[in-house]
């Protein structure tokens, strides 16, 4: 080639560059005008909408009074950027004037003025935009400006390059005004390009605020008062996702918190989605009651508009994705010298660029849309499942345990939401096949029919796989449900497991359940590996069939046609790959839909079980006519039968009877909780319910008492007084703001009951239903509470109370005596005594117990003093619950306060925040910043010490090499144009291609199998490590950690590790190697591309780092915000009866919706951030592709091989997708790795002492005598909490019966926990038979001790398994224990005897029966030391007396420590320990203590005796 030809080339290219510049400037200018117009239209529309709806913004009551004072400082960078814009504008205006004069003088073509005119117009607009930034106080450069500056500099460099080559060839005589202008503006454009890369305008805005800006009455500390900018974003902002810039900017400077994340737009909130789905679900149920309703249909009806909008983007994206494959043959022909029209190459390059640009934008909008659609579906379904959980009938609860329902929310709902990604594949697959066939028909002719046949065969092959995967998924989910159910049960009852030394046994059971789950997981993952093989093999099979058919038919294959076909196959690969995934996902989604649909169709509580009449319309408060009720409607024996009762307004009704007589069921029938077989129940007014097993919410004491009602200080103070809580609250370190642990773990049994009573009293109901609330209280507190609460505070209310305290019965207006589910006696106290029979037997047993106590009269001089009460009055002014709180103070300020008052609010809020740090339950720990490399290494080393990682990379590299080799072979071997001969024999061509391509698919199968093997081993190891760590955790961990947090890790996080992370890791390796292959192919043809790839890669890494700073924190917040949803659900299910009893369902549903929004807020920003990054990645890669195309077109014909250039274009079509997918796969991998990080946290819990210490194992006969010695024992629950036991010292002689008494909260149960080492003493020591228990293993200690705990616990299973979980005893021994514990006849009356079922939490057994089962366990264990912690509180006096006799007989030679509020239970003990405020007040024989007139024990006995003589003396 000579200089003349080169000169002609550059003469052609320079005008084209100028033409490109003109077109780009005009396009950007039009976009600018369109954006401005669209923004104005959107503003007008929103103004009109705002007038019609108040819902689109946060209400004024929720907004702060903030008036920000913005201080704007203009930096040197801004001034220089404005100066550069004006400078370039001036230069272009000069060029325009010069060229205009020249044209006029020389009478030239006016077309030459287009370039300087467009440049002048563009830089005028740019100067205006930059100047406008100052008035907008914008710290960030608009995306449009940044793109404009970047393109201007790029075109300038290209023009300078062409100008330089031309001047070198033709000489300086050809120098023009444009050349001079380019040289003049290059430094300015370079600086502007640098600013475009940084994105900073040079303007700094300092926002300051006065005290008047402090938000008032913000309920949640984590609340944000700003609605997401997404709701008001303009068209350009929506397309470019620049509305997210402020959040990402904040995240790049500091770790994001929930308060940084804006509120959702009203249309995106859970409430909106829930209402729509709920309405359509009801409609589907009512349309055809005879057929099961379709949940899928209800979902489609609810969200079809969003799906249709997504379909538009999906369809457009599909169309433009086939533009490249269609044009490749033309491009190869052009490079081969076949030019159809002038400048065809540039036109083709422009079309390629435009199509990829449209594909990029539509892809991001499409993916963003499906994410939002899935988000709405998940929110709505979660809310539906929660609501259903509150309404479940007793029968339905047996079919769905809380663990299973957690799985519905955590796994099934997630899967249904994820199906939005596959929703459009159903109709897109045929569309893509049709487009592919059209292109193939152009390329290979009639052989395209073979493509269709091969495609159909490939699809049919996947159908059996889908069925197999559906079965595997169904079995996997069933196994996961079972594991979650047992895990949830173990976490709830961990205290019992540790006390009984059963934790290893139950942990092994969980490991066995995991093994079963692991088996199905292994099958699912290996089947997925086979699906991956099918995915990569299908296009190879289709291509081989197509090419073989073409060769057989004699169709001429050309390089262009082959490359077009290969590009088409590569695109067709996606729907072919997605089809197995689609079928698999449809199968999985169907399973999840069926599970949730079945749950939503479960029977709810009978709405007509109780007829509620508004207050004031009747004098009859409660009326039951011919009531027959049964927990199991299919049972032949009803729970309650023949119930007749009429209670007038204001009456006090007492319900009594022996254990299992139906007392609690009687309360349930009034509430409508128990299924009604026949009869009628009517109540007049509202109800307040206090359950027998206290239900306490996590939160502070005030929140538990208010229970959603507004604070009224006087009323609140009276309630505290009436419930005897004032002294307790004063003793708490934070008063009524003390955080209560899960299930009230840091409260004593009596305190929990009094909080329950306070909650009921504060609601001011008309009817109060109290299920034995006094059993957990000592005599004095019980007497005071009965007097102040029932006789005084509820004097004008209707009260129905269940009680075993016979002494309270005389105060009742009506007494009901139940036996075997029937009311056998009813009437007043005296009338029933005279009638004799069962009621007289109950009362007589009580009086006999009282008469057995020989009680001297206390001296009159001490009668008005109470040393125990005085010792408890340790007033803490900081915990005064009656001072004005933050809300009251804020209200006063709103009514006319000053700034100083607001400062007081701020200070008080700061103090409250500081005080929370000392609470028992803390906010969930969250790692901040970059995921530690230690986490990655721990995961990669978890399976075979990382030995599989190199093999996975090697297999992927081999696959990629063979893929490129097969495509290169087809491009090289086929002729460039029709008529030319092929370089090889057609048969050899096909054999080599098939061998290379099939070999690549084999390697991908090897990679997929290795990834599955690696993932399985790593997941199993991580799970077992976490499980063992959790089970070895001290009890303080469970006290301070809500079960929802742990369940979140063993369900959601573990599912991510099981099913997601292995493929994420493999996908990242795959994408990395594929990207390297694409770049290698492109640079092999046009090495100049590498010069642009390097800066683009740097820019990508910078953006990835910028994005990850916010993304990882958003993912962590998402994970943390999921726990409260699960926790609330578990808590609500446990207290559903209480919630319904107070009619609080709507409030709890609203709370659930709020928590869902708190979860969705960071999730929404997280998915938007992903699309934000992908958009910018793909735009950069599209520019690289465009640059490659321009270079290929610029080369003279014959310079490069058209076949290789076509191959480079074929791979370049995938560059934008692969580059963004590479960065995205790493980002998603890091986001998913956070699940491993969270599991790793729980694998590193500091465990309690070893279970067995081989060097200090006690003798097998230990303890021989059972002597317990406490030496200066001090105990506290946590380092940040006060001491509970203050130097307790005493000796319990072996074989003696020790009674432990004291006021509620005096430290009795804490002492027992120290004995079992659930809490390790901070000082002192405890010895048993002269062996320091701190020196031996926990299992050796706890397995040698027996206990009947205060809260009786039954595990789901059978009676046999609950009595003998370790399977150490024969049936005869078990029956003997049941008979001695008074349960033998009850169990014999069951159809399955010892195999009689026990439901979750033992719900089908009464509380009293559960305590008797605990007694049976102790009888079987026959430990030398037995502890009874309020073991008989929930049984009647006669049964209690009988149990005490059994214990005295069966444990005659054992040391028995009894904690009891019933004085007769401990009066015959050998020694009595009186505790007061965590100290030993008295310790002696009962006789000596009763002889001492100043004895605290004497006062306790006297109080009990006085109370037991009857209510009139109270």
From Swiss-Prot:
This protein's UniProt keywords: ATP-binding, Coiled coil, Membrane, Nucleotide-binding, Repeat, Translocase, Transmembrane, Transmembrane helix, Transport
Positions annotated to bind ATP 1: 657-664
Membrane topology, from the record: Multi-pass membrane protein
Regions that span the bilayer: 16-36, 76-96, 111-131, 142-162, 177-197, 312-332, 334-354, 421-441, 446-466, 533-553, 946-966, 986-1006, 1078-1098, 1117-1137, 1155-1175, 1180-1200
EC number: 7.6.2.2
Pfam family, any one: ABC_tran
Regions annotated as coiled coil: 899-927
Signal sequence segment: none
GO terms assigned for molecular function: ABC-type xenobiotic transporter activity; ATP binding; ATP hydrolysis activity; ATPase-coupled transmembrane transporter activity; sulfonylurea receptor activity
One cellular-component annotation, GO: plant-type vacuole
Catalysed reaction equations from the record: ATP + H2O + xenobioticSide 1 = ADP + phosphate + xenobioticSide 2
Residue ranges occupied by any ABC transmembrane type-1 domain in the UniProt entry: 307-588, 949-1231
Protein's UniProt keywords contain Translocase: yes
Subcellular location: Membrane
GO biological process annotation, one example: abscisic acid-activated signaling pathway involved in stomatal movement
InterPro entries on file: AAA+_ATPase, ABC1_TM_dom, ABC1_TM_sf, ABC_transporter-like_ATP-bd, ABC_transporter-like_CS, ABC_transporter_C-like, ABCC_6TM_D1, ABCC_6TM_D2
ABC transporter domain mapped to chain residues: 622-845, 1268-1502
UniProt keyword Membrane, yes or no: yes
Effect of disrupting the coding gene: Increased water use efficiency. Low phytic acid levels in seed tissue.
Family: Belongs to the ABC transporter superfamily. ABCC family. Conjugate transporter (TC 3.A.1.208) subfamily.
Protein task: Pump for glutathione S-conjugates. Involved in regulation of K(+) and Na(+) cell content. Mediates resistance to NaCl and Li(+), confers sensitivity to sulfonylurea drugs such as glibenclamide (inducer of stomatal opening), and required for stomatal opening regulation by auxin, abscisic acid (ABA) and external Ca(2+). Transports oestradiol-17-(beta-D-glucuronide) (E(2)17G). Involved in the root auxin content regulation that controls the transition from primary root elongation to lateral root formation. Plays a role in ABA-mediated germination inhibition.
The name this protein goes by in its record: ABC transporter C family member 5
Organism: Arabidopsis thaliana
Gene this protein is translated from: ABCC5
